[in-house]
Amino acid sequence: MKKIWKHLFNQNMLYILLMLVQIAFLVLSVLFLNRNYAWVYGALLLLNGLLIIYITNSRKNPTYKNAWLVVIAVLPIFGGLSYLFLKTRRDTRIFFHNYKQQMEQTKPLLTQEPDAARHLFNDSQQVYNLSTYLQHTGFPVYEQTNVTYFPLGEEQFAEMKNRLREAKRFIFIEYFIIAPGKMWNEFLEILIERARAGVEVRLMYDGFGTKFFSTGDFLKIAKQHHIQCQCFNPFRPLLSSAQNNRDHRKILVIDGNIAFNGGTNLADEYINEKVRFGHWKDTAIMLEGAAVWSYTMMFLQLWNMNNPNKKEAYDQYRPTYLPKQTNGGFIQPYGDSPVQDDVKGVMVYLDLISNAKRYVYIETPYLIPDHDLLTALKLAAEKGVDVRIITPHIPDKWYVYQLAWNAYQELLESGVKIFEYTPGFIHAKSFVVDDELAVLGTINLDYRSLYLHFECATLIYHCNVIQTMLADFLKTQRKSQPITLEDCKNRKWYQKCNSYVLGLLAPLL
């Protein structure tokens, strides 16, 4: 009985109940007005008409436009008011204003070093054009950076611990999910030891992905050991579109000289200490050298987002050494955000797919591409490019898995090869293209990751590590089962119905 009460009155349930109360209040208010005043109904219809014109002419992704237009059409009384309520809240406006302000204030600190840009131009005009796009959005391209690839989360974690123990100046940590367990306990033990030694430690976690900090003793422990903590966008039971904008990034910066990034969060399933969906396949990279500066700045931009007037001494966090030997090439870390027109994640993926000559190999846990990405993948395959995608065989979300099958059939009909990782769940987010280009980071092939979340990734060109990534992809493919058109046709009728209905909600999943 105690367990039942605990589940009924835990934090998540209280949030859901408060949200439902707000929705019920809005619905009842509108219905009451509509029954008693004919002019209210007329005003709502006029409002809906104006909103339809506004949404149709906005710069938003067409899929999101269609989703809202359907809501307004199906719910003429409630739909328009819902849009206004969600999009005009003051907290949402302040949220995006603060981010834009931070980006403008720090732009002079992320200027392009001329030699790297010139060398890239001489090497490849096509890649230079993509790089220039990222430069214009505030993310330079670098040389003098070594890249190490980790095919599994446990291998990355072992190296992270080694590097953390050597920290001398500062440690910046930014993760979507941090959960109690072996991984976090070992991580925290090292942070406390380094903080005692005088190392500056800052930790930022997402307010939705990581909730246990608010209920446990961690914040008290952190304060005792001089570990600075910040919750990004605390989750509140309010109807606000800003609650969708989560910090999905995974960043660890050590002394400004080393940065880790990839798909792994700080929880036991990511290092296969806890089995949830079979074997957990994740990937990550470690950067050493000049390119670490971009990850340092990405962290500080979000850290100072709620305190835009803070005078941060940014230059003290610059790299203090460059590796004498690297595995060559050009490295360009970049961040993505839900701010309007900031769609670097989509644009980079589209460019890689559209300009591929021989092959595009993709790993993603969620395959819910928007229309542009779906079209680009199909066109590439129809042009003769070898397009392969590996997704999980054991999904973590049943509804996302059902949606993936919507894309499967359309892609297979165009010649795209699809594989499911048979041992379990693949959480990696990576592209490998033509032996020359690669992207690895936190950006999934779904709407939330591409348009709603704060994300980050690294573009890699002409670097020896790409061959290591390619070999790991092919090794993973050998452990995966191919999906065929026959598999799509043989699905149960109710599975197909689920996929079609869920397709209406794809932008929200």
Regions found by a protein language model. Give the residues of each.
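Helical hairpin unit composed of two closely spaced alpha helices linked by a short loop
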Residues: 366-387, 392, 397-399
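Surface segments flanking catalytic/ligand-binding clefts of nucleic-acid enzymes
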Residues: 417
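N-terminal localization/anchoring segments of enzymes in phospholipid and broader phosphate metabolism
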Residues: 1-347, 351, 355, 395, ...
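Thr-Gly-centered strand-to-loop micro-motif
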Residues: 362-364, 421, 440-441
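Short, solvent-exposed amphipathic alpha-helical segments in soluble enzyme
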Residues: 301, 376-379, 406
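Catalytic-core elements of nucleic-acid end-processing and repair enzymes
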Residues: 429
